[in-house]
């Protein structure tokens, strides 16, 4: 693995040795995760081990990606030659699949902590052009809460606001495929572009804690609507519907199934099917899906929701955990074209502060959004593009 660990701290000799040893351990853990996670070629998340064909087509979306392309070119122009060599990858590179939520993962590209103020603003310009205002602010708040975690955990070396890396895959183009990846603790964005089409999955957003009650960013709080709207969805079901939707009323651990290096998970539909809901409940489920999709820019959110709507009847809602106002829980929304997971996780970096470190908590949340059936990272669109336009 070619990436280096960025260390934003000045050490004494013994402290420096400890950090060096830890960095080497993290490098080895990262390499092992990659070797195991990338052992199989990409297929995509499926319900039965086989990709459902013809779900995704190369077709004009009617929403311009020129602002994203211009912002990417501005960011690239801001980098030095050395930085550029670390940041640029081919569009079909395995780098797309090299992401992990954990803070120890050794990442590729250039970190925000290494950037000048101008470079960092150019990076944020790329993100603002690609995301909705809501999506950008959520991502920034994940970063801010990683600073809060650094304060609480006493670890400014491997945790912090600027320990997030950016890579560019392919050359920004109006016609050729390209994209970018943003990667760090509790925030991973994969953003693929082909013409005016966009695929923004896998997407991972989370935090521990989800609310800052002290420190530099006191008052920052995230993922409450995702939590509350999911709970509202299950509470609004009839008793009979709830019995079908809830897979287990007991939640004892972490339940997400499609996080890092889980690109080929076989995950059958479970829970309650939207076709069996009332119109009002189906609209509520759609609004829950849109809450996640709308982290993308507004125009491409509409395009993706049109795709979601075409499969709304075959969209499933599943639940694990209690359904009370203070319950910890997991829910999943799954259709042929979208997969969303929300999970209250066990304490991790803050386990020593927890009354029960083995019990899932509302202060540690993981959210994942995927495009099943082979189009995570825009892989199916890229496949179709190469069939139509063979590359050397």
How should these model regions be labeled?
Residues 1-12:
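N-terminal export signals
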Residues 13-78, 85-132, 136-392:
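A cross-kingdom marker for long, charged
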């Amino acid at each position: 693995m070619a990436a280096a660990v960025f260390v934003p701290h000045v050490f004494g000799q013994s402290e420096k040795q400890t950090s060096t040893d830890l960095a080497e351990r993290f490098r080895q853990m990262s390499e092992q995760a990659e070797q195991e996670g990338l052992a199989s070629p990409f297929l995509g998340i499926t319900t039965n081990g086989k990709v459902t064909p013809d779900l995704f087509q190369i077709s004009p979306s009617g929403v311009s990606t020129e602002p994203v392309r211009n912002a990417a070119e501005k960011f690239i122009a801001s980098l030095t030659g050395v930085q550029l060599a670390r940041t640029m990858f081919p569009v079909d590179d395995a780098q797309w699949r090299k992401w992990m939520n954990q803070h120890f993962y050794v990442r590729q590209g250039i970190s925000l902590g290494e950037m000048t103020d101008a470079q960092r603003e150019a990076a944020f310009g790329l993100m603002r052009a690609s995301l909705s205002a809501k999506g950008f602010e959520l991502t920034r708040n994940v970063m801010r809460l990683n600073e809060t975690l650094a304060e609480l955990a006493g670890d400014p070396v491997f945790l912090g606001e600027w320990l997030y890396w950016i890579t560019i895959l392919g050359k920004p183009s109006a016609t050729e495929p390209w994209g970018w990846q943003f990667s760090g603790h509790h925030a991973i964005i994969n953003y693929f572009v082909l013409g005016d089409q966009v695929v923004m999955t896998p997407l991972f957003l989370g935090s521990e804690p989800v609310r800052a009650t002290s420190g530099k960013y006191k008052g920052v709080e995230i993922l409450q609507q995702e939590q509350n709207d999911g709970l509202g969805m299950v509470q609004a079901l009839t008793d009979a519907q709830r019995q079908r939707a809830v897979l287990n009323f007991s939640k004892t651990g972490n339940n997400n199934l499609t996080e890092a290096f889980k690109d080929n998970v076989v995950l059958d539909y479970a829970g309650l099917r939207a076709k069996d809901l009332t119109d009002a409940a189906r609209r509520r489920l759609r609004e829950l899906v849109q809450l996640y999709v709308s982290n993308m820019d507004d125009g491409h959110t509409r395009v993706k929701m049109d795709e979601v709507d075409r499969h709304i009847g075959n969209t499933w809602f599943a639940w694990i955990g209690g359904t009370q106002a203070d319950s910890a829980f997991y829910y999943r929304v799954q259709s042929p074209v979208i997969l969303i997971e929300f999970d209250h996780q066990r304490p991790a970096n803050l386990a020593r502060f927890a009354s029960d470190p083995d019990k899932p908590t509302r202060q540690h949340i993981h959210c994942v959004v995927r495009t099943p059936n082979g189009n995570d990272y825009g892989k199916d669109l890229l496949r179709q593009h190469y069939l139509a336009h063979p590359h050397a």
